[in-house]
């Protein structure tokens, strides 16, 4: 509990009128040797109605004098005890420190407030559990170079401690201490200074790192793979977009090559690429373009690389197409198409590779991007024997109606040059036919057309099956017409197996009385028909 006097002392800011020394002493508002003490605002005091100090500065002064009464008053006024301890250390008032020792807590928290190296060490000594390493580490953190210099010999004898202090100085970015350690002591590993410089994009620290590295190379016998280190730094700087770091590295022998610029491309630092692109061989630029496609670089980067090649990429077309497909990176295809001069159309080449190796989803996406017709893709899929693609793209383009699908696929078969591709489309048509409900009277005309289509393309087995299905519809007159028309097709196109199937059906129809001898003679009177059928059976049956 506070006494009434303490409550008054704590909360009175302005005295009502000047009081005498005796009254002030009784109130505890008199500082011996200085005069009256009065609080102003939240964090200042007025001394002898004349001098203004911060409460913490007044605490330091009171601590230096060992004036505990004033210290207690200033603490009531919300001063920081740490300043009283600093003052006590400056005045060697250890009796005062002893009184407040339990309230101090961690002495290391006082260190940032101290500017004097001697007081810094004395404060650190207040912590009984700390050693010389702890002191030196805090000296690094708080820029107390003179303390490190004082203990130089102790540091020099412990290589591990030297490395620890150096790395700590790097992380704290204390350049003066880093430089002193680098020149005065032996450092085994310098990597930390570069790592920190990259992490914080601190060019001055990076420059200092090379200063120490060159000093180490020139003064120590240690072997350093400088070319590899320089290359690593260039790649790291390029990946971070740090052009100034790269220029600094080049000063010391660094060389910008494909791996360096690839890092810049990967992390989308076009300005880095633009700065060095004209310093590398054309062959390297082509490799960078291929990598840019792989990395899905933005438009400006691709245009930069293409323009440096004058958009002449014919020698790497195959690799470009490969990367476009493998990495789903089609932007370069669009850019090459947009050229008014030297336009290069890679759409067909990319599409062909997509159809051969990629998924349905990738192909559909490409079709959408480049307005590719489904017919074009289906033909490619047929040539590559990708039945699944034919079915999926057909349904996506024309719906799931069997007649519509068959109609479009028949058109494709008519224009398909590859026989294996044509056979696959016909196979797909027949698959759709078998899995549909076409074997009804309403579909008679469509089945009629399908049978003629099979005859036209010499699809023997499929023709035979559709003829059987068509006959089952019980449309005798139309069936006879179909058979006779297909015989004409077989003769004209030299399809002996189709002709043999037709001949069998003609005999069957004749025996049933559905076709006359005159109709048979008329149908078989076609030029070269005798090479496909033998009419002796007809003469034999008549006699």
UniProtKB/Swiss-Prot annotation:
Keywords: Early protein. It comes from the Viruses. InterPro entries: MGF_505. Pfam families: DUF249 (PF03158). Plays a role in virus cell tropism, and may be required for efficient virus replication in macrophages. Belongs to the asfivirus MGF 505 family. This is Protein MGF 505-10R. It comes from African swine fever virus (isolate Warthog/Namibia/Wart80/1980).
């Amino acid at each position: 509990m506070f006494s009434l006097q303490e409550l008054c002392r704590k909360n009175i800011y302005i005295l009502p009128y000047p009081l005498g020394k005796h009254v002030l002493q009784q109130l505890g508002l008199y500082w011996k040797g200085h005069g009256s003490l009065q609080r102003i605002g939240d964090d200042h005091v007025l001394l002898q109605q004349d001098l203004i100090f911060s409460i913490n500065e007044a605490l330091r002064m009171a601590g230096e004098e060992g004036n505990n009464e004033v210290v207690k008053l200033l603490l009531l006024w919300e001063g920081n005890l740490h300043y009283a301890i600093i003052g006590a250390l400056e005045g060697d008032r250890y009796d005062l420190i002893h009184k407040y020792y339990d309230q101090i807590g961690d002495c290391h928290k006082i260190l940032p407030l101290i500017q004097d190296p001697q007081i810094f060490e004395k404060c650190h000594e207040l912590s009984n559990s700390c050693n010389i390493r702890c002191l030196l580490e805090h000296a690094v953190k708080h820029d107390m170079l003179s303390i490190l210099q004082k203990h130089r010999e102790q540091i020099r004898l412990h290589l591990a401690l030297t490395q620890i202090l150096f790395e700590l100085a790097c992380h704290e970015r204390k350049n003066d201490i880093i430089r002193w350690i680098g020149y005065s002591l032996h450092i085994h590993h310098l990597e930390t200074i570069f790592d920190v410089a990259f992490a914080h994009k601190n060019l001055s620290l990076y420059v200092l790192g090379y200063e120490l590295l060159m000093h180490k190379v020139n003064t120590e016998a240690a072997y350093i793979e400088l070319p590899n280190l320089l290359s690593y730094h260039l790649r790291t700087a390029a990946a971070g977009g740090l052009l100034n770091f790269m220029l600094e590295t080049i000063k010391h022998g660094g060389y910008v090559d494909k791996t360096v610029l690839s890092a810049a491309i990967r992390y989308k630092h076009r300005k880095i690429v633009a700065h060095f692109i004209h310093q590398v061989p054309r062959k390297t630029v082509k490799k960078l373009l291929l990598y840019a496609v792989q990395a899905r670089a933005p438009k400006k980067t691709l245009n930069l690389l293409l323009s440096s090649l004058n958009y002449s990429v014919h020698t790497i077309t195959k690799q470009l197409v490969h990367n476009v497909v493998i990495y789903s990176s089609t932007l370069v295809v669009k850019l090459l198409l947009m050229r008014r001069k030297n336009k290069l159309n890679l759409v067909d080449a990319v599409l062909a590779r997509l159809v051969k190796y990629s998924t349905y989803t990738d192909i559909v996406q490409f079709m959408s991007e480049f307005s590719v017709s489904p017919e074009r893709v289906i033909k490619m899929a047929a040539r590559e024997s990708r039945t699944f693609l034919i079915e999926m793209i057909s349904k996506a383009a024309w719906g799931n109606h069997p007649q519509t699908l068959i109609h479009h696929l028949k058109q494709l078969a008519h224009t398909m040059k590859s026989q294996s591709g044509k056979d696959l489309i016909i196979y797909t048509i027949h698959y759709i036919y078998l899995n549909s409900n076409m074997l009804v009277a309403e579909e008679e005309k469509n089945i009629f057309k399908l049978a003629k289509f099979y005859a036209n393309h010499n699809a023997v087995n499929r023709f035979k099956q559709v003829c059987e299905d068509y006959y089952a519809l019980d449309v005798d007159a139309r069936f006879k017409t179909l058979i006779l028309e297909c015989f004409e097709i077989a003769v004209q196109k030299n399809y002996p197996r189709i002709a043999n199937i037709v001949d069998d059906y003609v005999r069957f129809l004749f025996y049933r009385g559905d076709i006359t001898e005159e109709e048979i003679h008329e149908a078989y009177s076609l030029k070269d028909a005798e090479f496909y059928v033998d009419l002796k059976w007809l003469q034999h049956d008549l006699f």
